[in-house]
Swiss-Prot record:
Gene Ontology CC terms: chloroplast thylakoid membrane; phycobilisome
The protein's name in its UniProt record: Phycoerythrin alpha-2 subunit
Keyword Magnesium on entry: no
InterPro entries tied to this protein: Globular_prot_asu/bsu, Phycoerythr-like_a_sf, Phycoerythr_a
Keyword terms, alphabetized: Bile pigment, Chloroplast, Chromophore, Electron transport, Membrane, Photosynthesis, Plastid, Thylakoid, Transport
Family according to the record: Belongs to the phycoerythrin family.
Binding site for (2R,3E)-phycoerythrobilin 3: 64
Organism lineage string: Eukaryota, Cryptophyceae, Cryptomonadales, Hemiselmidaceae, Hemiselmis
Name of a matching Pfam family: Phycoerythr_ab
Residues that coordinate or bind (2R,3E)-phycoerythrobilin 1: 52-53
Miscellaneous remark of the record: The light-harvesting system in Cryptophytes contains phycobiliprotein complexes. Unusually they are composed of either phycoerythrin (CPE) or phycocyanin (CPC) but never allophycocyanin (APC), with only one type of biliprotein being present in any one species. Unlike cyanobacteria or red algae these proteins are not arranged into higher-order phycobilisome complexes, and they are found in the thylakoid lumen.
Gene3D superfamilies: Phycoerythrin alpha chain
Binding-site residues for (2R,3E)-phycoerythrobilin 2, renumbered to this chain: 63, 67, 72, 74-75, 84
Amino acid sequence: MYTKIALLGLVGSAAAFNAPMMTVRRDAIATGAAAAVVAPMLRPAGAAMKKDSKAPCVEVFDERDGCKAAGTQKASGDDGFCVKVSMKAIKMNAAEATSVTKNYNTKLL
């Protein structure tokens, strides 16, 4: 008896949540129309490329040449190095480019 009541309850709840076909079709058409409006906005833009051919150049300066005082041997995190990063224009070298294209994909040994 209880199993029949539970089964009827499950069937009744499933029937209550079943949406009519008309609303499903209407929602599908509205979703398709919204996608057609938004689709042109989702196209990827072309990547912007700078024409100045600059690349980061890293320079490391070292002051550990024996000029330090005798009392500065503690581990303070100051190791006497300085790092400079700057953007520099890279010049085109036609001979180097020809060498790379000529020797590309060849065995060195």
